[in-house]
Amino acid sequence: MKLSVFTSVLLAGLVAAQQEKLPKCAQPCVDQYTTGGGVAGCGQLDIKCICSNKNFLSGIACCLEKECDAQGKETAVKYAKQICATAGVTDLPDDVTCDKSAASSGTASGTATGATTPTSSDSTNTASATGGSSTVEPNAGAREGAAGFIGVGMAMLLAL
């Protein structure tokens, strides 16, 4: 029990210290790709997975391009490079570049079933479709792309 409390206090201190390095403009971008159980489809503490996730990185870059000024972007890049280097990922871009084609791609899935019923002998048919659904994952398009590496470090901040 004491170990859990100690670990929680230690992690809270680390998060607070690291948040000072994260530009405020980047926080909405990080929030967009962070869930309770992970970051962009990776485990919360799987830094290598997050830093290597190209579409996710592109999506974060597009968000940062909209949200941050030049200083904020520079700070976010530096922070992300530091975090990713700890996992051995060093092939990150030096600046924020939004690859809209990678960031806007997504996945969609759905099913539709139909039934036709003749309504008269003159071959007039009535069709009805039921059960159609479509699900678009907003984070899926952001999971693999080259330019948005910045969000990795920021996402790790929230994951801690």
From Swiss-Prot:
This is Effector CFEMN1. The gene is CFEMN1. The lineage of its organism: Eukaryota, Fungi, Dikarya, Ascomycota, Pezizomycotina. A lipid is attached at N139 (GPI-anchor amidated asparagine). Its main location: membrane. GO terms for biological process: effector-mediated suppression of host innate immune response. Keywords: Cell membrane, Cytoplasm, Disulfide bond, Glycoprotein, GPI-anchor, Heme, Iron, Lipoprotein, Membrane, Metal-binding, Secreted, Signal. It comes from Gibberella zeae (strain ATCC MYA-4620 / CBS 123657 / FGSC 9075 / NRRL 31084 / PH-1). Interacts with Z.mays LRR5; the interaction is direct. Interacts with Z.mays WAK17 isoform 2; the interaction is direct. InterPro entries: CFEM_domain, Extracellular_membr_CFEM_dom. Residues 102-140 are annotated as: Disordered. GO terms for cellular component: cell septum; cytoplasm; external side of plasma membrane; extracellular region. Disruption phenotype: Decreases virulence in maize stalks. No sensitivity to Congo Red (cell wall disrupting agent) or sodium dodecyl sulfate (SDS) (membrane disrupting agent), and in vitro cell population growth appears normal. Residues 140-160 form a propeptide. Belongs to the RBT5 family. Residues 1-17 form the signal peptide. Suppresses host programmed cell death during infection by binding to Z.mays WAK17 isoform 2 and Z.mays LRR5, to prevent activation of Z.mays WAK17 isoform 1 and the downstream hypersensitive response. It holds the Pfam family CFEM. The CFEM domain mediates interactions with host proteins. It is a lipid-anchor; GPI-anchor. Heme binds at D46. Residues 18-111 form the CFEM domain. Disulfide bonds join C25-C68, C29-C63, C42-C49, C51-C84. Residues 102-135 have a biased composition (Low complexity).
